[in-house]
Amino acid sequence: MKTGKYRYVVALLLFIAGAINYMDRAALGVVAPIINKQLGLSPSQLGVVFSSFFFGYSIFAFVGGQLADKYGPRRVFSWAMGTWSILCGLTAAATGFGTLLISRALFGFGEGPMNSTTNRTITNWFPRHETATMVGFTFSGQTVGSAIAGPVVGLIAIAYGWRTSFLIIAALGLTWIVAWRMFATDKPAQSARVGAAEREMVEASRSAAHPAEGGDESTPLRSYLFRPSTLALGVGLFAVNYTLFVFISWMPSYFTNALHLDMQHMSILSAVPWACGGIGYFGGGLLADACFKRMSNKLLARKLSATVPLALSGLALLGVSMVDSVIPAVLLVASAVLFLTASSQACWATMHELVPGRHLGGVSGFVHLMSNISGIVGPTMMGLAVQYFGGYSSGFVLGAAVDLVGVLAMLLVIGRRGAARTDETQTTAA
């Protein structure tokens, strides 16, 4: 029986939102070589500026998830996109270290609800067996945005100045809000464009996924936040995001300073790793859902889909630390990003196996907060490594070590004890 496909329109809007989100976020890293010269920033100062974004971002990742649970993702996403687009445009007014630091910190507040609200939307709109694929597809928009940021923002900055580039990409976000308000609703049942068969299929899938939820109404959100499995998943996503955020912030500077590329070639080559990241998100999602369908232990299927690529990304980072020529370095960075994004979407899909749907936004926001502390730590650590501890290579080795910690946390801790429910098909603990 045909069930309709309108839910994929919502997925496309989430994909575009992710692309805009990461284009906005990556823009500063792309123009950093120019800003360094104009504003006279040291590597350690630049690292602090990159990290300042994540102070506000981490806090509102948690708050945004709770708001999405309470007020619905349609309203929260509209507010978030409008706020971060305006604040991104205000980055163009920065005149020195202090004003740049403040503008990036405020910008982070606006972007904070992005991933937890996306996760809430996927829970509302998609059946359980499509979770990893849709997380992978929508999150792949983030790497598309990062890939576009290199050539587009870089070339705009060369032609019209770096301040103009921030104003242009801010306008894109404000335009997206119009489409989101026109075509998206909080749930399929609220949309006149969704047929009865599609709506019933999604609702039946989610009801079957949480058989104990109706009898668990009194369980408060906080009981899910500090379970070992929730904390271990947060550590795993911390490891994933640590290097991704280092690359978003420092890859352009690494390409220009360590690999000696000019601005034009850097802008073009920086798109390669993020294109591979898009493949990792979407391809990893397809593979993760294939494992999910084939394996009887559903939680183990999600764990393996998250930990194997994270371990491979650590090996790629060690390789990056050992090379100093352009082609091997770009290929190894691209491999690391591919494996990291494949692991990322599997981590978010694992969340759906640990938490009832009614608490998913809040718990996702909490895990998102944990994981995005890496954005405060990672860029600053790379800046210190460049200035004081032997350059970029030592920073990449540290990233590989963080990956290892994430792999061990998820493999050894996530299991039946921290699950919010026991699925009928999940017969053994991983």
Language-model features, listed with the residues they occupy:
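Extracytoplasmic
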Residues: 9-43, 247-252
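Residue-level signature of mid-helix packing/kink "hotspots" within the transmembrane helices
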Residues: 26, 54-62, 112, 146-147, ...
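Extracytoplasmic gate region of multi-pass secondary transporters
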Residues: 28-29, 226-282, 344, 348
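Helix-breaking motifs and short loop linkers at transmembrane-helix boundaries and internal kinks
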Residues: 40, 72, 93-99, 110, ...
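Conserved MFS/SLC helix-loop-helix module at the cytosolic interface between two early adjacent transmembrane helices
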Residues: 59-98
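Cytoplasmic helix-loop-helix junction between adjacent transmembrane helices
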Residues: 103-141
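Helix-loop-helix hairpin linking two adjacent transmembrane segments in secondary transporters
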Residues: 138, 142-189
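C-terminal transmembrane helical hairpin of 12-TM major facilitator-type secondary transporters
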Residues: 299-347
